[in-house]
């Protein structure tokens, strides 16, 4: 890493070179921008899917006769490739088969599924078919029903243990239980949330530790003293006090409960009291009575009574016998076991836990309430923390996380007896590191084991889960009177995803230590407490529910088939007379995989995080793939007003972009990954940093999670940091950050430094030059509007870029990349053939004028030539909005900031007619129209050119089959596909019967159902695709044939279209001015766009001004370098690379310019620069098929480290613009008058984008159209050919102007006066006098509502005649039409 003083030529690809102004050069390789979900889904296919299914096997029948084992998964190849899937509207998918075996223990037979003879032609895989699974493409998308979709990653709270001041337990969609105080929230990945807390509603001297648990039916929550739960888990009261060193909160918890050994027999519940009385009376047969789960407690009480009798007899006979004390100890131990079982029973009943769990001997080896409760909490399948949760818990509950700046209250020894730290030591970083190191090496002597009243192995409590660490520290560093034990977990096993008893102990210790300021509260908005769920986790969670349902169906079938697989017939005397064989069991008859297929289909079609891929342009597609959402299942609602969740957090630095987010209700909930961010195996976001050792920046790059970053001091990379040739920091102090605080630090104390200044923002934000000079709100708009840019016919890369354009275009998936290093053997408009170094040939088919999800045009343009050498992953063909392998979202145009007759008032934009004529901002839109030929109950529909009641003019472009021809120019109403449908059974009149008898072939019982071009769809037919069952295509049920017609629209820029820059500067075109009338420079160069100068200061996006000046300097620099090359052959050779043009084109250009110079008699370079203007150069460019847009000299100014004020002055001086004199303002001449403007005007080259908010998609007109069935008013919206709403305020406006007749028409015949509009239509057709409007339906409806209130309503006309409103129907009955209609027949379908 080293600092660069000014600039250098940086070559991004063979066709893209820029003058790079970055002040910090680094060799850090940016990761692939689109492979996060690809790697995640590949992990799911390779590992997660098989592991998920294997976790449910083996499955056994209730009597263990049948066992189904899982042997693995098999995958089939896709039936069709990606292109076929898109074209045929099918899913690009693979088949998943399970290799299962059925073992019959009664006969010893092993059965495996085989492919059936019936399906042998279509399936070559043995095993049980589970589902078809969509396959991810090389570009990271799924093709589902021919549509490209993508699954957004979800960011949620990570499972783990959190210390909070307030938490809540969700009981239902509308009910929740809020708890405040010192709260420890145990948040699992699978299972119910638990709250261990000390309430703040009591005085601290009266408070004790409680736990809040949600019941099994999730309808309520129960509170228990924490010691009750610990006793139910098998800890005695003495053991609890020993672990927590008689802590006051724990002591009060023991006093608050009823399960105390001293008075348990006196204050016991009636059940135990009755058992004691009956066993003391000698009724020993009660041990086996009652339900099975109660037998354990009965047995314990019975054993206790026997010991009690033996103790009583021995103490009376031999009071001093040592055996008396042993009996008392045995009785105490047995009493602890009774308390454990009784407390467990109490909690099981309170939480409504089903006793059916005792039937599963794998989960409950012992038939007891204690075993049932332990299986509920300590089994991974019941209560799963997940790998991320275990990582968080292990980190949170370590002792070393809580004892910083505390004083040791005891001597700390190693196992060999050596003193590690003595009592009274203040624990700072060095001492804590010693403890960590000794603990990792298992050398320290502070590990203890929980002693249980039961056998831990009998309830799946491993010995490792009972180990804990304990260390005493003083509460106050100044007063050593009070000490407390800090309890933590020991030797955390990251593979154990279940919660353990030591986790409970450590969590309780955390809660009781928090009031003593030992430990810290968690910030739930910190990224260390959030994790990202990628597609493998999202689909696994949905798939798990489908497998669970399949398992339940399978067990039900095994239960039916269990026992003896033979039927018995019994006679009247009850004797078996015959045994009949049942149908033989097979795996395929047992497995029902429909639930799995349903959840997969629903996931890719209806899941909240599965979206249509944004195909607007390459940036929008790539940003879509890097987006993360806080919404979705289990996430945050967009209506949630919590601002803390949406706000920027310091831990997001380098991980989540602080700029790119939507502006509406989703602000802060939809986010974008930062440029270099990665996701680790646990789902935590990571940012890269360079390691600093003793003040020297090394080349070692580490990716840190937010939690790890909090442990280090990190410096910002900046041009202000002085570094020598060995990368040693020379400054005495540099800016660094530790967590949320910034300060000046000695370089020797700094651990890491940023890898690049732009690592903090997303790829979209990193494309904005001079981002540091824009207001944050405008930067957000600029980032979002870049994703709305419409791909143009002639895209050009920005003159002023940031250096990210090539990387984004290459990783977007829309460009064609070389599959290997080699030589181009063949290239044309449709394919490229590359021969690799090993001699293997690769042929790549280019995409030509295909439609995207957003109706934009996909087209590949080759960049390579035959014989050219290419390297692997090099861009060999441009895609949409890509020019010479760089992202090209718009055009470089000459912009001036001045007013122009008020046409650019506010944000309106005035443009030159040149942008229209030269197709500078022209785009292509491709619309798809589909016609399906269906099989109906009345017969099959037919594709035909013989359409009834359609003129030849409307069928002029149809071929002999009735399908539109490619290249036809179609307009609204033209037939695209001729189709007729059979009519239903109708009664035929005598006349029709006679006509049919005379002309049997001319009468067709069909109706016209042709596909016609809708309103606003005018264009040229670019492609027609035809699929039919007869040709072997797979179509949907009931579809015989399907035709897709693609119509291309060439949309030139026009008034009403929206334009935008990259700095949040946007506006709508208000005027297209002839080139001759536009203001122009003194050399005659006309301005392309006029912007309002008042739109800059208040918006505070000054970056656009810097961009404009730098762009104009680069534009003029290219012109000067071109003229200089005419006088210096060496400069001519270097110019080809600098302006990114082939040498042969440049030679022709220089030859033409030399001819101009010679003809004018210009002797030297200075004279040529002074006298050759843009018009002279434009003539030469036109002769060789180029334009000024091809001559731009491109620069790269990376954000936060790019062009500064001095650099800008230098390049403007180099371009001859004299910034000291002109200040970037130039003399403009009014094209209409020929007079100069009063003062110089700021102008320059700015990058302008055409957004997808085009007027053609919004404006429309309605003459005749559909009406609402209910209100009889016209429908609304362009899609329904609706009308414009004339609301209350518009009525006021016409009333104010006294436009009574206009208002009457709008409220009657143009709205819902049914009779009046029919009469008006007939009058127009006949040329008759215009009738008077009638009463609108809405007024008639009002009268009916008033009548519903028991009010009598009458109409009184101007002539004082009166009519009862009861005689007025809301709609006129059929057959009551006006006489004007007698001669007309109307088709009222849809109106």
UniProtKB/Swiss-Prot annotation:
InterPro entries: DNA-dir_RNA_pol_bsu_ext_1_sf (IPR042107), DNA-dir_RNA_pol_bsu_external_1 (IPR019462), DNA-dir_RNA_pol_su2 (IPR015712), DNA-dir_RNAP_su2_dom (IPR007120), DNA-dir_RNAP_su2_hyb_sf (IPR037033), RNA_pol_bsu_bac (IPR010243), RNA_pol_bsu_CS (IPR007121), RNA_pol_bsu_protrusion (IPR007644). Keywords: DNA-directed RNA polymerase, Nucleotidyltransferase, Transcription, Transferase. One of its GO terms (cellular component) is DNA-directed RNA polymerase complex. GO terms for biological process: DNA-templated transcription. It is an enzyme of class 2 (transferase). GO terms for molecular function: DNA binding; DNA-directed RNA polymerase activity; ribonucleoside binding. It catalyses: RNA(n) + a ribonucleoside 5'-triphosphate = RNA(n+1) + diphosphate. PROSITE patterns: RNA_POL_BETA. Gene3D superfamilies: 2.40.50.100, 2.40.50.150, 3.90.1100.10, DNA-directed RNA polymerase, beta subunit, external 1 domain (2.30.150.10), DNA-directed RNA polymerase, subunit 2, domain 6 (2.40.270.10), RNA polymerase alpha subunit dimerisation domain (3.90.1800.10), RNA polymerase Rpb2, domain 2 (3.90.1110.10). HAMAP family: RNApol_bact_RpoB (MF_01321). The RNAP catalytic core consists of 2 alpha, 1 beta, 1 beta' and 1 omega subunit. When a sigma factor is associated with the core the holoenzyme is formed, which can initiate transcription. Belongs to the RNA polymerase beta chain family. DNA-dependent RNA polymerase catalyzes the transcription of DNA into RNA using the four ribonucleoside triphosphates as substrates. This is DNA-directed RNA polymerase subunit beta. It comes from Mycoplasma pneumoniae (strain ATCC 29342 / M129 / Subtype 1). The lineage of its organism: Bacteria, Bacillati, Mycoplasmatota, Mycoplasmoidales, Mycoplasmoidaceae.
């Amino acid at each position: 890493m080293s600092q660069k003083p000014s600039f250098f030529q940086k070559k991004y690809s063979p066709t893209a070179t820029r003058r790079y102004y970055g002040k910090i050069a680094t060799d850090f390789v940016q990761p692939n921008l689109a492979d996060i979900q690809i790697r995640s889904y590949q992990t799911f296919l390779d590992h997660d899917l098989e592991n998920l299914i294997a976790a449910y096997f083996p499955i056994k029948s209730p009597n263990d006769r049948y066992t189904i084992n899982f042997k693995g998964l098999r995958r089939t190849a896709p039936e069709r490739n990606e292109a076929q899937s898109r074209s045929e509207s099918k899913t690009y998918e693979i088949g998943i088969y399970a290799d299962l075996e059925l073992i019959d223990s009664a006969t010893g037979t092993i059965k495996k599924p085989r492919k059936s003879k019936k399906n042998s032609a279509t399936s070559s895989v043995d095993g049980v078919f589970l589902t078809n699974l969509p396959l991810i493409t090389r570009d990271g998308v799924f093709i589902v029903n021919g549509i490209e979709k993508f699954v957004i990653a979800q960011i949620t709270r990570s499972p783990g243990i959190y210390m909070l001041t307030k938490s809540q337990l969700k009981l239902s969609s509308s009910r929740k239980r809020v708890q405040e105080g010192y709260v420890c929230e145990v948040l699992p990945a699978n299972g119910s949330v638990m709250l261990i807390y000390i309430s703040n509603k009591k005085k601290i001297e009266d408070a004790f530790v409680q736990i809040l648990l949600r019941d099994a039916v999730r309808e309520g929550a129960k509170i228990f003293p924490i010691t009750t739960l610990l006793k139910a888990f098998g800890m005695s009261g003495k053991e609890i006090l020993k672990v927590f060193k008689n802590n006051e909160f724990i002591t009060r918890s023991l006093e608050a409960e009823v399960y105390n050994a001293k008075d348990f027999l006196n204050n016991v519940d009636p059940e135990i009291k009755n058992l004691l009385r009956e066993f003391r009376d000698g009724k020993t047969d009660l041990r086996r009575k009652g339900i099975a789960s109660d037998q354990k407690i009965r047995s314990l009480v019975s054993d206790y009574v026997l010991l009690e009798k033996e103790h009583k007899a021995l103490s009376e006979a031999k009071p001093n016998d040592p055996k008396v004390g042993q009996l008392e100890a045995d009785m105490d131990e047995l009493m602890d076991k009774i308390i454990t079982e009784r407390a467990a029973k109490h909690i099981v009943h309170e939480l409504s836990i089903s006793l059916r769990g005792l039937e599963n001997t794998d989960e409950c080896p012992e038939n007891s309430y204690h075993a049932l409760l332990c299986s509920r909490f300590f089994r991974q399948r019941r209560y799963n923390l997940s790998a991320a949760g275990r990582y968080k818990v292990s980190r949170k509950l370590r002792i070393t996380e809580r004892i910083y700046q505390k004083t040791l209250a005891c001597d700390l020894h190693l196992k060999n007896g050596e003193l590690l730290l003595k009592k009274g030591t203040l624990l700072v970083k060095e001492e804590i590191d010693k403890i960590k190191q000794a603990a990792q090496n298992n050398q320290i002597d502070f590990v203890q084991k929980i002693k249980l009243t039961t056998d831990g192995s009998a309830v799946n409590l491993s010995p490792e889960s009972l180990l804990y660490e304990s260390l005493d520290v003083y509460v106050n560093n100044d007063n050593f009177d009070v000490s407390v034990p800090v309890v933590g977990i020991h030797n955390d096993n990251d593979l154990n995803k279940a919660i353990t008893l030591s986790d409970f102990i450590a969590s309780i210790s955390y809660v009781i230590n928090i009031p003593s300021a030992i430990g810290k509260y968690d910030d739930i908005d910190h990224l260390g407490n959030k994790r990202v769920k990628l597609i493998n986790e999202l689909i696994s969670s949905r798939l798990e529910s489908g497998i669970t349902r399949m398992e339940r169906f399978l067990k039900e079938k095994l239960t039916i088939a269990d026992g003896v697989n033979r039927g018995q017939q019994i006679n009247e005397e009850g004797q078996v007379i015959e045994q009949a064989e049942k149908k033989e069991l097979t795996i395929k008859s047992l497995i029902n995989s429909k639930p799995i297929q349903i959840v997969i289909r629903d996931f890719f079609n209806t899941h909240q995080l599965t979206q249509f891929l944004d195909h607007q342009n390459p940036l929008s597609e790539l940003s879509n793939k890097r987006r993360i959402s806080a919404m979705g299942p289990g996430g945050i609602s967009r209506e949630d007003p919590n601002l803390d969740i949406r706000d920027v957090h310091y831990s997001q630095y380098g991980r989540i972009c602080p700029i790119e987010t939507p502006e509406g209700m989703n602000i802060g909930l939809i986010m974008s990954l930062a440029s270099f961010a990665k996701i680790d195996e646990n789902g935590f976001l990571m940012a890269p940093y360079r390691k600093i050792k003793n003040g020297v920046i090394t080349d070692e790059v580490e990716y840190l999670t937010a939690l790890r970053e909090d442990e280090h001091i990190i410096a910002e990379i900046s041009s202000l940091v002085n570094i020598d040739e060995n990368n040693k920091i020379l400054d005495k102090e540099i800016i660094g950050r530790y967590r949320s605080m910034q300060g000046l630090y000695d370089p020797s104390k700094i651990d890491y430094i940023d890898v690049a200044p732009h690592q903090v923002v997303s790829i979209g934000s990193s494309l904005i030059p001079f981002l540091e000079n824009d207001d944050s709100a405008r930067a957000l708009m600029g980032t979002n509007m870049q994703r709305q840019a419409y791909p143009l016919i002639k895209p050009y890369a920005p003159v002023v870029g940031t250096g990210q354009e090539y990387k984004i275009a290459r990783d977007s998936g829309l460009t064609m990349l070389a599959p290997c290093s080699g030589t181009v053997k063949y290239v044309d408009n449709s394919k490229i053939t590359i021969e690799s170094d090993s001699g293997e040939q690769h042929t790549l088919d280019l995409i030509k004028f295909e439609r995207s999800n957003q109706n934009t045009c996909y087209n590949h343009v080759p960049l390579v030539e035959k014989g050219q050498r290419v390297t692997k992953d090099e861009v060999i063909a441009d895609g949409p909005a890509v020019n010479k392998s760089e992202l090209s979202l718009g055009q470089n145009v000459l912009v001036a900031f001045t007013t122009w007759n008020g046409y650019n008032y506010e944000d309106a934009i005035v443009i030159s007619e040149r942008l229209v004529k030269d197709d500078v901002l022209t785009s292509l839109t491709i619309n798809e129209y589909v016609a399906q030929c269906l099989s109906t109950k009345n017969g099959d529909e037919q594709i035909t050119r013989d359409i009834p009641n359609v003129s030849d003019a409307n069928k002029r472009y149809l071929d002999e089959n009735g399908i539109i021809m490619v290249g036809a120019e179609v307009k609204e109403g033209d037939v695209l596909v001729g189709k007729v449908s059979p009519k239903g059974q109708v009664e035929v009149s005598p006349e029709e019967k006679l006509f049919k008898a005379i002309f049997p072939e001319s009468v067709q019982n069909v109706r016209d159902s042709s596909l016609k071009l809708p309103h606003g769809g005018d264009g040229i037919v670019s492609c027609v695709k035809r699929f039919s069952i007869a040709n072997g295509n797979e179509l949907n049920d009931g579809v015989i044939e399907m035709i897709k017609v693609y119509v291309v629209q060439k949309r030139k820029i026009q008034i009403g279209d929206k334009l935008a820059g990259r700095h949040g500067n946007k506006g709508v075109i208000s005027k297209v001015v002839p080139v001759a009338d536009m203001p122009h420079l003194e050399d005659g160069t006309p301005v392309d766009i006029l912007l309002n100068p008042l739109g800059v200061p208040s918006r505070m996006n000054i970056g656009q001004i810097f961009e404009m000046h730098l762009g104009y300097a680069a534009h003029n620099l290219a012109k000067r370098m071109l003229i200089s090359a005419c006088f210096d052959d060496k400069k001519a050779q270097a110019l080809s690379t600098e302006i990114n043009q082939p040498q042969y084109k440049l030679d022709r250009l220089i030859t033409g310019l030399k001819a101009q110079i010679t003809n004018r008699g210009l002797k030297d370079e200075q004279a040529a620069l002074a006298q050759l203007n843009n018009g002279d150069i434009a003539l030469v460019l036109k002769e060789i098929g180029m334009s000024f847009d091809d001559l731009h000299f491109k620069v790269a100014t990376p954000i936060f480290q790019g062009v500064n004020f001095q650099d800008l002055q230098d390049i403007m001086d180099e371009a001859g613009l004299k910034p000291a004199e002109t200040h970037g303002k130039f003399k403009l001449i009014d094209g209409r008058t020929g007079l100069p403007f009063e003062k110089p005007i700021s102008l320059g080259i700015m990058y302008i984008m055409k957004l997808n908010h085009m007027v053609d998609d919004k404006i429309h007109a309605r003459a005749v159209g559909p009406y609402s069935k209910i209100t009889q008013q016209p429908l609304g919206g362009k899609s329904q050919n609706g009308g414009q709403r004339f609301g209350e305020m518009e009525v006021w406006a016409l009333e104010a102007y006294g436009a009574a007749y206009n208002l009457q028409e709008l409220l009657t015949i143009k709205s819902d006066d049914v009779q009046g509009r029919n009469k008006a239509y007939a009058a127009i057709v006949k040329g008759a006098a215009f009738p008077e409007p009638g009463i609108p339906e809405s007024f008639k409806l009002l009268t009916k509502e008033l009548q519903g209130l028991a009010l009598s309503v009458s109409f009184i006309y101007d002539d004082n005649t009166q009519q009862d409103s009861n005689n007025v129907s809301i709609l006129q009955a059929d057959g009551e039409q006006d006489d004007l209609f007698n001669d007309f027949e109307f088709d009222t379908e849809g109106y």
